[in-house]
Amino acid sequence: MAKVAKDLNPRVQKMSLGQQQSARGVPCLRCKGTCSGFEPHSWRKICKSCKCSQEDHCLSSDLEDDRKIGRLLMDSKYSTLTARVKGGDGIRIYKRNRMIMTNPIATGKDPTFDTITYEWAPPGVTQKLGLQYMELIPKEKQPVTGTEGALYRRRQLMHQLPIYDQDPSRCRGLLENELKVMEEFVKQYKSEALGVGEVALPGQGGLPKEEGKQQEKPEGAETAPPTTNGSIGDPSKEYVCELCKGVAPADSPVVYSDRAGYSKQWHPACFVCAKCSEPLVDLIYFWKDGAPWCGRHYCESLRPRCSGCDEIIFSEDYQRVEDLAWHRKHFVCEGCEQQLGGRAYIVTMGQLLCPTCSKSKRS
């Protein structure tokens, strides 16, 4: 009898289950008060109460998000963006860059200050360039603490970078041979596709960080001449966005991808997933077919994703209907949860239903 992968790391598995239990009761952002609070399904990534996704309940915390990104970036060339957790048995955490803007407000004798905190900001740039970058992102997607933009970022971290696409202990019931396939899959994408975008002025992508922080030109200073490797921008050159083909002004930040090479750049709002067109959260991307993808859609482009549990399928034995796939054990009605293998079923708008539940839903 094959041994399931969750038994291979009981300590981490217990932590995963504990996190799920602690998330009970978290309100749904989509249902706006009609949901009684998150009630985890035993294997679907949804709330049993309202049927909305985990993302709609924003279950993760800053610490959980930083640990997840730290795990993703460790053992890759981007591990410098992580830090070792003291006493954490080799666990690394994401060194997330935050940006705090403090502006004085003139109100009588005692000065007061308006403070804005960005929960994430591009690393390795000056505050001025970081603020310029933020101003080029749609306001509703700027990750300012306490705003819809901060919630949007957290939801995208869950959606674009599912923890169960990189951590076998977060998958349910992996067989030992499937575990080996997954470990190789993760190792390969970290080596061949994973990337983190770099913010710089046009023509300055790829500079060492120490130099990169000097990207702002002092008033009255002469423009630096281009170097032989092209790392300093040529003032006579026109830089064009790889996506929209619009001009990138020389004094406005762009995003670079080392996987693409530093001859290509994107406007901040144009650095999006090639599949879903959503901005790439924290500039984390996966390079494929000459374009950046989010983690979710990159993984789906290589292997099928189960429409039931939302996990990547690492077995060659699974159920497929048109362009949808299921683990065989998850090929069940979304209404009554009965197994549908060998039985009549109906797929409507991506929902797998038995004839009875389908009829009930229509009425």
Swiss-Prot record:
<dbReference type="GO" id="GO:0010611">
    <property type="term" value="P:regulation of cardiac muscle hypertrophy"/>
</dbReference>
<keyword id="KW-0963">Cytoplasm</keyword>
<keyword id="KW-0440">LIM domain</keyword>
<protein>
    <recommendedName>
        <fullName>LIM and cysteine-rich domains protein 1</fullName>
    </recommendedName>
</protein>
<keyword id="KW-0804">Transcription</keyword>
<dbReference type="Pfam" id="PF00412">
    <property type="entry name" value="LIM"/>
</dbReference>
<feature type="modified residue" description="Phosphoserine">
    <location>
        <position position="16"/>
    </location>
</feature>
<dbReference type="GO" id="GO:0008270">
    <property type="term" value="F:zinc ion binding"/>
</dbReference>
<keyword id="KW-0597">Phosphoprotein</keyword>
<dbReference type="InterPro" id="IPR001781">
    <property type="entry name" value="Znf_LIM"/>
</dbReference>
<dbReference type="GO" id="GO:0070886">
    <property type="term" value="P:positive regulation of calcineurin-NFAT signaling cascade"/>
</dbReference>
<dbReference type="InterPro" id="IPR010442">
    <property type="entry name" value="PET_domain"/>
</dbReference>
<dbReference type="Pfam" id="PF06297">
    <property type="entry name" value="PET"/>
</dbReference>
<dbReference type="GO" id="GO:0003714">
    <property type="term" value="F:transcription corepressor activity"/>
</dbReference>
<dbReference type="InterPro" id="IPR033724">
    <property type="entry name" value="PET_testin"/>
</dbReference>
<comment type="subunit">
    <text>Interacts with beta-dystroglycan. Interacts with GATA1, GATA4 and GATA6.</text>
</comment>
<keyword id="KW-0479">Metal-binding</keyword>
<feature type="domain" description="LIM zinc-binding 1">
    <location>
        <begin position="239"/>
        <end position="304"/>
    </location>
</feature>
<dbReference type="GO" id="GO:0005634">
    <property type="term" value="C:nucleus"/>
</dbReference>
<keyword id="KW-0539">Nucleus</keyword>
<keyword id="KW-0677">Repeat</keyword>
<feature type="region of interest" description="Disordered">
    <location>
        <begin position="200"/>
        <end position="234"/>
    </location>
</feature>
<keyword id="KW-0678">Repressor</keyword>
<feature type="domain" description="PET">
    <location>
        <begin position="99"/>
        <end position="206"/>
    </location>
</feature>
<feature type="compositionally biased region" description="Basic and acidic residues">
    <location>
        <begin position="208"/>
        <end position="220"/>
    </location>
</feature>
<dbReference type="InterPro" id="IPR047120">
    <property type="entry name" value="Pk/Esn/Tes"/>
</dbReference>
<feature type="domain" description="LIM zinc-binding 2">
    <location>
        <begin position="305"/>
        <end position="363"/>
    </location>
</feature>
<dbReference type="GO" id="GO:0005737">
    <property type="term" value="C:cytoplasm"/>
</dbReference>
<keyword id="KW-0862">Zinc</keyword>
<keyword id="KW-0805">Transcription regulation</keyword>
<comment type="function">
    <text>Transcriptional cofactor that restricts GATA6 function by inhibiting DNA-binding, resulting in repression of GATA6 transcriptional activation of downstream target genes. Represses GATA6-mediated trans activation of lung- and cardiac tissue-specific promoters. Inhibits DNA-binding by GATA4 and GATA1 to the cTNC promoter. Plays a critical role in the development of cardiac hypertrophy via activation of calcineurin/nuclear factor of activated T-cells signaling pathway.</text>
</comment>
